[in-house]
Amino acid sequence: MTKQLKLSALFVALLASGTAVAGEASVQGYTVSGQSNEIVRNNYGECWKNAYFDKASQGRVECGDAVAVPEPEPAPVAVVEQAPQYVDETISLSAKTLFGFDKDSLRAEAQDNLKVLAQRLSRTNVQSVRVEGHTDFMGSEKYNQALSERRAYVVANNLVSNGVPASRISAVGLGESQAQMTQVCQAEVAKLGAKASKAKKREALIACIEPDRRVDVKIRSIVTRQVVPARNHHQH
């Protein structure tokens, strides 16, 4: 009687153990170790499958029953070019360094300076160049207008001869219309008083209004920037 009870108890224990393994295996399709919760393998390293195994739904890559699905490659990052932006710059060239007083022929030393400027203006990002001639207020308005035009064209032609494309350069004379030193300099000369000779006052006035005798080179350049859009990072 005692031996029979022991055998019955052992049978119940084995049955319970088998039920537990079967219950776990029915979910995973493989025989799983109750201690490590890992799939049991045979001596050949093969995974043990049970009667509940369904390869289509339960097959695992590590057991050779499924093929790993490669992760999709990240989409290429689109580089967006912004609309061109324009940068304007004015370079003022003193007529004193370019021409003699009341002259429209370039000084020898001015040639080298204009050659350096031409190299810069020949760059592909330079869209347009406007050469403006200016004079002081001395002399008639008509005379000053003509002088400013001649000087502007002399500078523009020199730049073209040094490699600046003629299609991007223009020249205009503005005469004395933008003279800025007139009133300031007249006030300064007046301070010399009655004792100063007329010639001295004229000399002082010519020197004072020198900044008005100039050639402005107005440059418009194109700046195009490439922008990489920021990726959206989703938080889980």
UniProtKB/Swiss-Prot annotation:
GO CC, one annotated term: pore complex
Region of interest called 4 X 2 AA tandem repeats of X-P, as start-end residue ranges on this chain: 69-76
Stretches forming Sequence repeats: 69-70, 71-72, 73-74, 75-76
GO MF term list: porin activity
Boundaries of every OmpA-like domain copy: 86-223
Pfam family, one: OmpA
Major site of localization recorded for this protein: membrane
Highest taxon of source: Bacteria
Annotated keywords: Cell outer membrane, Disulfide bond, Ion transport, Membrane, Porin, Repeat, Signal, Transmembrane, Transmembrane beta strand, Transport
Signal peptide from the UniProt entry: 1-22
GO biological processes: monoatomic ion transport
Membrane topology value: Multi-pass membrane protein
Cystine bridges: C185-C208
InterPro entries reported for this sequence: Bact_OuterMem_StrucFunc (IPR050330), OMP_bac (IPR006664), OmpA-like (IPR006665), OMPA-like_CS (IPR006690), OmpA-like_sf (IPR036737)
Subcellular compartments: Cell outer membrane
Further remarks about this protein from its record: PIII is closely associated with part, but not all of the PI molecules in the gonococcal outer membrane.
Family (UniProt): Belongs to the outer membrane OOP (TC 1.B.6) superfamily.
Protein name (Swiss-Prot/TrEMBL): Outer membrane protein P.III
Provenance organism: Neisseria gonorrhoeae
